[in-house]
Amino acid sequence: MARNSEKAQSMLFRFREAQAADLGIIDAGRTRRPRAITEQDSIPACEKWRGQVLKDISRKVSRIQESSLSDYQIRDLNDEINKLMREKHMWEVQIRNLGGPNYTRAGGAKVYDEAGKEIGGAGRGYRYFGRAKELPGVKELFEAARAKKGDEKPLEARDDLRKQVDAAYYGYSPDEEDDELLAYEAAKEKEAFENLADNRKGEQLPPGWEPLPGDNGDGKGWELPTVEEVQQELINRRKQRLLNQL
């Protein structure tokens, strides 16, 4: 009886495993990650592999902090982490191409593993994690970059930029005082006004149009009405509106 029970369990286990493979539900802990990432056509499977890569990255980032590691081991671990970061990016691109969530949209934002723990140093390009930043040659690069960043001043504090500008930068260009240029601009302005007037001659004025004083060539300029005149005009219009309603 025990033998038959073991056979049944084994057959059931193989059936469930084949069924999970058909549905794209794979146990990532017992299966080796595929190398041909672009050939994967299941979003759940890609999500599983991406999660496994994140776990590996988090584990190696924690290990690279150990003080017992030699410089060679630290360099090898740092190379492995960078390879895993590139693999993670490839899985994210494949998930996006299949219509899944776009994990690459954040660009150089912070990266977290499945447990919500931030992976320090993650981003684009080759990165140094943990004790790899203290390696000979790498530490000097970080110190030089930090010193260069500290020496840079904001644009508001750079007096040399203000010393290099002249009046032309602020619009007081000597070209604006050129007689030939001013005459050319005046001629072009007159030509534009004449074209506008010619185009308006054939147009019909809208109903209720009242030309301003001085537009008819009578020589009288337009004067701004006073507050009393405006109030009296509004009262007259309201009276006329009431009379029309009666």
UniProtKB/Swiss-Prot annotation:
GO terms for biological process: generation of catalytic spliceosome for second transesterification step. It holds the Pfam family Isy1. Keywords: Cytoplasm, mRNA processing, mRNA splicing, Nucleus, Spliceosome. Transmembrane segments: none annotated. The keyword Transmembrane does not apply. GO terms for cellular component: cytoplasm; spliceosomal complex. The keyword Nucleus applies. It is found in: Cytoplasm; Nucleus. Residues 196-223 are annotated as: Disordered. Associated with the spliceosome. Involved in pre-mRNA splicing. This is Pre-mRNA-splicing factor ISY1. It comes from Pyricularia oryzae (strain 70-15 / ATCC MYA-4617 / FGSC 8958) (Rice blast fungus).
